[in-house]
């Protein structure tokens, strides 16, 4: 079960390792560094090492484990900060006695779970009940916000059977809490189990994504929505607001479990993001957001190979909570750094490069990642449903959206939220470019909006979007000929577009009145602008200049409403405002002939 190092090239080690399996976890060198077999040629294995290889030398041992890189799944996951291979960073700090991560700290020294933690286990089954993989056996209260459901693990060796015994009371995470009698023998179930990170967890059926994931961000929820179980990409250059977007989604997205994966970002930026996440409070309860969050951190100065592990690890943790019936959101920042790690490892093991040096399997890996999202019927008894939503940022060099990572990502996502440096530098946040962005979920979530908010939602949204497109066309004329060349109707279009941008699309992520915005407030803000547009058209037909409409008191107040009205009073106050706006615009046509 062991071999010897033959040569070392950065994060890649070649070893003579008879019997090695693809993607098998191995320990490299005297320090027992984490590694994963990524290529096999006869008895030779190419290993990507998840720790710094400085000081390794040929002839040192390589030890096989016989199992793939796996996530440890069970209570005590929530509230922890892991590295790419699920080692708790706080435990590593206490072992290292240094702010820098020491090498060779294995799961024996820093286990991903606190196996000695005691929880009050409440059984959901009783002796004699028939259970199958995926069924809930019981639950523990992991945090004040989350109940952790213990399921019969859907491992290949676990078969359906009869409950022989089930625990009730206080038990450790590593204690047996149930015995299942199957045709293959008796299975002892603990509160935790392992799952290979590259293998998607099973489900019974994939459902269409019909319920929107409300984020509190107006440009997303209304203009370019994402559904629960959907996928989204947030590409943008440096300074365009990707990290603030991830923070906002972490805090306000209506998912029960949030898993941010900081993959390959700058260390200082990751530290700032971590400090911000640790201070966040759950908006509905006031409890620390960390009680329903697990964070995976792999900065740019950590070994590049671990970036790949961090992405798969975060997705596996998300699937685990999805299998408990929760709505889960995985936020990866950023997939470009993961792709760069793939490129470096692929070139070092001698694989044929493709476009811009990336490996030919880049689209396959991106597809495997995004396809693990979904709203699904869970395996086991009953019709339990869970969802895993994936939103990932992309960092194209120089903001070039035609580079391979961004262009391939476009093939596999349902929502595209490109961040514009032009908008960011003009202090328009979120800097989502509404002319480039798209969402494939508008049709599927329309029923939810019509049923829960208003049947007019889709029609008004489409009108406002068409006004923004028309504004872009008119801006070309204005640049050449000036506003004097425009008709009153076209001037009105520009005025309405300004209201859409300033009064609806722009949003202050740090203002508690402006963020988050409830669905009903979003709709009524949108409707107020729509009323200004429609009633203004009638007034212009009656001979009222667009400049007079723009100077009305209610119209002047329109861009400020988002900052003035809280979510709890928005419905009543905005309804009154729309009536006043309609009345004031109509009063301008009194005594005029069309």
From Swiss-Prot:
Oligomeric and partner information: Has multiple subunits with at least A(3), B(3), C, D, E, F, H, I and proteolipid K(x).
One Pfam family recorded for the sequence: ATP-synt_ab_Xtn
Source organism of this protein record: Pyrobaculum calidifontis (strain DSM 21063 / JCM 11548 / VA1)
InterPro entries reported in the protein's UniProt record: ATP-synt_VA_C, ATP-synth_a_Xtn, ATP_synth_asu-like_sf, ATPase_F1/V1/A1_a/bsu_N, ATPase_F1/V1/A1_a/bsu_N_sf, ATPase_F1/V1/A1_a/bsu_nucl-bd, ATPase_F1/V1_b/a_C, P-loop_NTPase
Primary role: Component of the A-type ATP synthase that produces ATP from ADP in the presence of a proton gradient across the membrane. The A chain is the catalytic subunit.
N-terminal signal peptide: none
HAMAP family, per the entry: ATP_synth_A_arch
Domain of life, source organism: Archaea
UniProt-listed Gene3D superfamilies: 2.40.30.20, 2.40.50.100, Bovine Mitochondrial F1-atpase, Atp Synthase Beta Chain, Chain D, domain 3 (1.10.1140.10), P-loop containing nucleotide triphosphate hydrolases (3.40.50.300)
Protein topology in the membrane: Peripheral membrane protein
Main localisation: membrane
CDD domains linked to this entry: ATP-synt_V_A-type_alpha_C, ATP-synt_V_A-type_alpha_N, V_A-ATPase_A
SUPFAM superfamilies tied to this protein: C-terminal domain of alpha and beta subunits of F1 ATP synthase, N-terminal domain of alpha and beta subunits of F1 ATP synthase, P-loop containing nucleoside triphosphate hydrolases
Keywords: ATP synthesis, ATP-binding, Cell membrane, Hydrogen ion transport, Ion transport, Membrane, Nucleotide-binding, Translocase, Transport
Record's keyword annotation contains Transport: yes
Family: Belongs to the ATPase alpha/beta chains family.
Binding site for ATP: 236-243
Gene Ontology terms: biological process: proton motive force-driven plasma membrane ATP synthesis
Localization per Swiss-Prot or TrEMBL: Cell membrane
Annotated protein name in UniProt: A-type ATP synthase subunit A
Reactions catalysed according to its record: ATP + H2O + 4 H(+)(in) = ADP + phosphate + 5 H(+)(out)
């Amino acid at each position: 079960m062991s071999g010897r190092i033959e040569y070392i090239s950065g994060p890649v080690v070649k070893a003579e390792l008879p019997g090695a399996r693809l993607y098998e976890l191995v320990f490299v060198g005297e320090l027992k560094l984490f590694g994963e077999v990524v290529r096999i040629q006869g008895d030779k294995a190419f290993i990507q090492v998840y720790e710094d290889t400085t000081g390794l030398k040929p002839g040192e041992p390589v030890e096989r484990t016989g199992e793939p890189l796996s996530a440890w799944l069970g209570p005590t996951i929530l509230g922890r900060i892991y590295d790419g291979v699920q080692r708790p960073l706080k435990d590593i700090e206490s072992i290292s006695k240094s702010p820098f991560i020491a090498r060779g700290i294995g799961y024996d020294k820093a286990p991903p779970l606190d196996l000695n933690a005691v929880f009050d286990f409440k059984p959901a089954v009783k002796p004699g009940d028939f259970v199958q993989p995926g069924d809930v056996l019981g639950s523990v209260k992991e945090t004040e916000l989350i109940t952790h459901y213990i399921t019969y693990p859907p491992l290949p060796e676990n078969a359906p059977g009869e409950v022989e015994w089930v625990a009730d009371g206080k038990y450790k995470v590593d204690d047996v809490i149930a015995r299942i009698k199957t045709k293959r023998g008796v299975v002892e179930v603990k509160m935790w189990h392992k799952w290979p990170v590259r293998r998607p967890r099973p489900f019974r059926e994939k459902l269409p994504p019909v319920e929107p994931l409300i984020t509190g961000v107006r440009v997303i929820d209304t203009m370019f929505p994402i559904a629960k179980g959907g996928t989204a990409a947030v590409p943008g250059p440096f300074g365009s607001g990707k990290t603030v977007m991830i923070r906002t989604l972490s805090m306000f997205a209506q998912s029960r479990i949030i898993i941010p994966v900081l993959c390959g970002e700058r260390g200082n930026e990751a530290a700032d993001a971590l400090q911000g996440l640790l201070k966040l409070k759950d908006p509905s309860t006031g409890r620390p957001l960390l009680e329903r969050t697990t964070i995976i951190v792999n900065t740019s100065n950590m070994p590049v190979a671990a970036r790949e592990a961090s992405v798969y690890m975060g997705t596996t943790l998300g699937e685990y909570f999805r299998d408990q019936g929760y709505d889960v959101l995985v936020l990866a920042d950023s997939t470009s750094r993961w792709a760069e790690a793939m490129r470096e490892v692929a070139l070092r093991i001698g694989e044929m490069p493709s476009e811009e040096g990336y490996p030919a399997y880049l689209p396959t890996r991106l597809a495997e990642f995004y396809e693990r999202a979904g709203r699904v019927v869970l395996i086991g008894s009953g019709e339990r449903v869970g969802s895993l939503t994936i939103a990932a940022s992309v960092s194209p060099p120089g903001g070039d959206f035609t580079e391979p990572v961004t262009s391939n990502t476009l093939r596999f996502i349902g929502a595209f939220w490109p961040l514009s440096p032009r908008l960011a530098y003009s202090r328009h946040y979120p800097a989502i470019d509404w002319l480039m962005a798209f969402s494939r979920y508008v049709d599927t979530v329309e029923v939810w909006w019509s049923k829960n908010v208003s049947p007019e939602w889709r029609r008004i949204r489409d009108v406002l979007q068409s006004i923004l497109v028309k504004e872009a066309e008119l801006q070309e004329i204005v640049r050449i000929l000036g506003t004097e060349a425009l008709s009153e109707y076209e001037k009105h279009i520009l005025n309405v577009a300004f209201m859409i941008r300033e009064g609806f699309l722009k949003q202050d992520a740090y203002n508690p009145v402006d963020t988050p915005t409830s669905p009903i407030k979003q709709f009524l803000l949108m409707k107020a602008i729509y009323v200004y547009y429609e009633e203004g058209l009638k007034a212009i037909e009656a001979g009222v200049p667009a400049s007079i409409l723009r100077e009305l008191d209610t119209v002047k107040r329109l861009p400020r409403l988002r900052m003035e009205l809280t979510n709890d009073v928005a419905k009543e106050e905005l309804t009154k405002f729309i009536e006043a706006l309609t009345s004031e615009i109509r009063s301008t046509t009194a005594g005029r002939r069309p």
